[in-house]
Amino acid sequence: MRIYLTGASGFVGSNLARVFEARGAEVVRPAHADVDLADRDAVLRTVADARPDAIVHSAIWNAFAELTRDRRRAWDSYVGATRHLADAANGSGARIVLISTDWVFDGTQGPAAEDEPTNPINAYGFLKAASELVVTERAARGTVARIAGVQGLHWERPDAPRTQDAGFGYFVAALVDALRAGERFTVWDDPRLNTRATPTLATDAGELIWRALERDAGGILHCCGGEHADRLELARRAVDVFELDEELLDVGPPDAGAVPPGGAPFDTRLDAAATARLLDTALPDLTAMLGRLRAQMETHCLST
């Protein structure tokens, strides 16, 4: 399978590339220097040249504070780019998979199923929800793959410092880095943060997306873990799996500037039962997921 993967140099994209290549796929990595995804002609040309079986769109403009300040660029970077890629997929006959997020929900609905109506509360969630509509309404062969609470290594920059943020990304890695250094780690507690989610190892999400590609599965999928957790529970489970000192954990307010404009949805738990049935697979449990993350962090090798 030949996959045109946007955002391959990013956190999520680097994990997808690792999984796809491990499964035998040829991954085409368009760099921003080579193609501006907001440039329709450039996208159509590079996709036509690549002749992919599938387009997996994971690239984002991740300067979240800027999304409300430069709304035109934000729209073009998310919705415009997705539209161009959907048109390119239609022209080439490829399936397009949009990597989306649990932040398309407002955080009040409890575990959200794949068909739960979206209701984002911040610019990032809105732009992703709008991009989902492009794929579901415009693409002849479209798939939305929502991921959630993503943990893992950045395979392009595996030794880069990790920090806690308003979402769950890098949470476990940041905690492990601190506690292994003998430093205290404050688990943030604030209703404006994403506090409950479905922790997911990025490579596990990649395996689910690969399974969807193999089965030519369309529609909206929840490519996530099989257990929910809040920040403190995830911290305690990680301490146990990584054999760290729980006495170094604190609970307190977030750092100044950590809350994004509009806040983050408080409870973004996903119900992925329909996805598991469609893909005929079991969803990974949290302890096993953390064990694989530990192996990846300690060996810098893909673990399964």
Question: Predicted regions span which residues?
Answer:
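N-terminal Rossmann NAD(P)H-binding glycine-rich loop of SDR-like oxidoreductase domains
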Residues: 1-22
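Rossmann-fold cofactor-recognition segment
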Residues: 29-39
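NAD(P)H-binding glycine-rich loop region in Rossmannoid oxidoreductase-like domains
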Residues: 37-80, 88-90
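Conserved Rossmann-fold NAD(P)-dependent oxidoreductase catalytic core, especially the SDR/UDP-sugar
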Residues: 83-121, 138
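NAD(P)-dependent short-chain dehydrogenase/reductase
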Residues: 137-196, 203
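Glycine-rich Rossmann NAD(P)(H)-binding loop
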Residues: 187-196, 221-228, 278
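Mid/C-terminal beta-alpha module of Rossmann-like enzyme folds, strongest
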Residues: 206-260, 294-304
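C-terminal amphipathic/interface module of NAD(P)-dependent oxidoreductases
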Residues: 247-248, 261-304
